[in-house]
Amino acid sequence: MQIFSIKTDSDLNAFSENTKLSDSGCVCALGFFDGVHVAHRALISEAKKEAVRLSIPLVIFTFFSQSSLKSGQKRLFTDEEKFTELEGLGADMVTVFNFDLIKNLSKDEFIEDILVQKLNTHTAVSGFNFRFGKGASGNAEYLEKRLAALNRRGIIIPEYKGGDGAVSSTVIKALLSENKLMESAFLLGKPYFIDGAVKHGLGLGKNLGFPTVNMDIPKEKFSLPNGVYYTVLELSGKLFEGLTNVGTCPTFEEREIHTETFILNFEGDVYDKSVRLYFIEHLRGEIKFSSAEELIMQINVDKKRALELKKEIQWQEIGLNLQ
């Protein structure tokens, strides 16, 4: 999958001049796609089917998160996590725009200058609530109508319902804030996760007999409430169960919020390796223990509960094949 960063007019012109899209055009799926949740997946699936039917590439039109979120707003996925998920759904190309570059375009300029001239869009696929153009003046119905006038096509994907109602990134964040991880997993299509490289910690867990994997939480990424979680760590295509503390490790008076994971039944060096950490269930809040011995006792209690949960969870229903 090709990824094109379009932050300036020069980037846009270079993309148009140097990118060899099919003469027959492309199917363009439009959206921010934060979380790439089940509603996004349904939209992209329809776009992919259309691209295969027409034998033309599937192009994702999206934005850099930093340029399109309000100040202080957190996102479910980093840009890199989003791109990984989009590739897994069959996208041939992702065009990532700086929102400031196009926010002042009229709705017709967006359609004609960006979608038609620059991307050579044959068919645009958008959600029912897609808005575009300066002041969000354009909607999905207008896009469909205007493309038809230009001998192109627009497809509108209706509202996707899941769980107790509509699926959205806002709904998923609310569930995660309440530690309703299973409910959020059904809406995301897989458990909430963090991708990143394992960093060197202080070695405190190792000294206690519970060596841990430490990962930072990107500042722009939505973070779960502090506490201890039953997790699954993916390393080199293999899955390992774990206990993860999200927080500051108050027993040892650390400061920055991060994740610290004790991997069950694992031996090996994972420092500096790229891993994915899935959050399965919340076990308890973060506690400051009066001694290392108390902490060790609690870790053993947490481990026992994690092993019980493994038997209770329907893993395939949340997109993981844990044996």
How would you label these PLM feature ranges?
Residues 29-31, 61-62, 94-98, 123-128, ...:
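Short beta-strands and strand-loop turn motifs
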Residues 37, 86, 124, 184, ...:
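Residue-level signal for inorganic ion chemistry
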Residues 150, 201-323:
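Phosphate/ribose-recognition catalytic cores of enzymes acting on nucleotide-derived substrates
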Residues 17-73, 78:
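N-terminal catalytic cores of NTP/NDP-binding nucleotidyl/phosphoryl-transfer enzymes
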Residues 105-211, 290-294:
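Classical nucleotidyltransferase
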Residues 49, 56-120:
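Active-site-proximal cofactor/substrate-binding loop regions of enzyme domains
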Residues 1-26:
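Positively charged, low-complexity intrinsically disordered leader regions
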Residues 33-35, 65-67, 100-102, 129-134, ...:
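Short histidine/acidic/glycine/proline-rich micro-motifs that form metal-
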